[in-house]
Amino acid sequence: MIKHLVAPLVFTSLILTGCQSPQGKFTPEQVAAMQSYGFTESAGDWSLGLSDAILFAKNDYKLLPESQQQIQTMAAKLASTGLTHARMDGHTDNYGEDSYNEGLSLKRANVVADAWAMGGQIPRSNLTTQGLGKKYPIASNKTAQGRAENRRVAVVITTP
């Protein structure tokens, strides 16, 4: 009799445990932390385009000290919730050859990833980078303001 009761109880407890697991890749605390910095969700990924606060000068990939501090503060807060993996997508405006822009955008992604790793105190190997050049503008390249907005790094939070 006891043998017949054990199997249904085990099965029921497994079902209930599965129902209690968090939905999606991220916890509510992680989602709240990402939203507090302006990250937006699209197709299950959370990303932030660092164009408003952290712009790069034309033909440059160096971070200003205040930009570096902003990145490190954000990384520390997100890492404190367990978000320790990300992808940095570097971008440029439309000036220059494709190969030059791809290299420059990769340098931008790498400098942001270095600051992110330092601020979050996470291994640099947890962060991937890619240089996308001028392929994905977010603003018109016909104006100086639009070109400035396109010189950016987008941070995409990933899972291990």
Swiss-Prot record:
Residues 43-160 form the OmpA-like domain. This is Putative lipoprotein YfiB. It is found in: Cell membrane. Belongs to the outer membrane OOP (TC 1.B.6) superfamily. A lipid is attached at residue 19 (S-diacylglycerol cysteine). It is a lipid-anchor. A lipid is attached at residue 19 (N-palmitoyl cysteine). Residues 1-18 form the signal peptide. The gene is yfiB. It comes from Escherichia coli (strain K12). The lineage of its organism: Bacteria, Pseudomonadati, Pseudomonadota, Gammaproteobacteria, Enterobacterales.
